Amino acid sequence: MKIAIAGASGRMGRMLIETVLNDPEVKLSGALDRTGAPQLGQDAGAFLGKQTGVLMSDDIDAVLAQSDYLIDFTRPDGTLAHIEAALRTNTKLVIGTTGFDDAQKARIRAASEKTGIVFASNFSVGVNVTMKLLEFAARHFSQGYDIEIIEAHHRHKVDAPSGTALTMGEVIAGALGRKLEDCAVYAREGVTGERDPSTIGFSAIRGGDIVGDHTVLFAGIGERIEITHKSASRLSYAQGALRAVRFLEGHSNGLFDMQDVLGLR
């Protein structure tokens, strides 16, 4: 399996490269970075002190032409450009980018009719098992409990709330028979009045090098339940992305997420 990495000089990109290089069953076939990036032309393994023979490139079509899969944890505009190129080269996609709007998500769905795509807000096995716990908890705490989602990430993260927090909200809202857009409240300030018990609240923290912390609070009278997942390293995301690649080996097209990959449906 020949795998290319987008955003190859970034924190997640480097972790993906290292994880691919350490897996004897897959091969690093390309490393994409933005035009003008200082790392262009360097060996993709230079940051590890390794020579891979794969040079950092901004030529999307050339990289994907020699790749079976592209793992993309970048930004929405870049990912959409990569999708268009992947359709030209018949390359399958593992997408961990967050911050897409509804129209952009529709483009991903359309692309999945022609190639296999795993699209998820979080590739950690632990986070995806947590999603099932939240679904179960929401059904049992549907009355008399206020629901709040608190997430924390590093200072460089550009979107808030995180894609994972929003997915958690969607899972909870779905379990309660609601739509998230109808019940979400994003942060609070000033005189807000009493809390509407039908809402799901979100709070986002940005600071330091926090990889990703998510806590869902079910607050009742006399008790509260907290379900928390904390990521100490991006390695769990990279390992999950490789599981997604292996899952796509048996799917020529279609849109999937990590619940499909892990058999949690």
From Swiss-Prot:
EC number: 1.17.1.8
Coiled-coil annotated residue ranges, if any: none
Top-level enzyme category: oxidoreductase
Keywords: Amino-acid biosynthesis, Cytoplasm, Diaminopimelate biosynthesis, Lysine biosynthesis, NAD, NADP, Oxidoreductase
Any Pfam family matching the protein: DapB_N
Binding-site list for NAD(+): G7, A8, S9, G10, R11, M12, D33, G96, T97, T98, A120, S121, N122, F123
Compartments (UniProt record): Cytoplasm
One CC-aspect GO term: cytosol
InterPro entries cross-referenced by the UniProt entry: DapB_C (IPR022663), DapB_N (IPR000846), DapB_N_CS (IPR022664), DHDPR_bac (IPR023940), NAD(P)-bd_dom_sf (IPR036291)
GO molecular function: 4-hydroxy-tetrahydrodipicolinate reductase; NAD binding; NADP binding; oxidoreductase activity, acting on CH or CH2 groups, NAD or NADP as acceptor
Active site: H153 (proton donor/acceptor), K157 (proton donor)
NCBIfam families per UniProt: dapB
Name of this chain's protein: 4-hydroxy-tetrahydrodipicolinate reductase
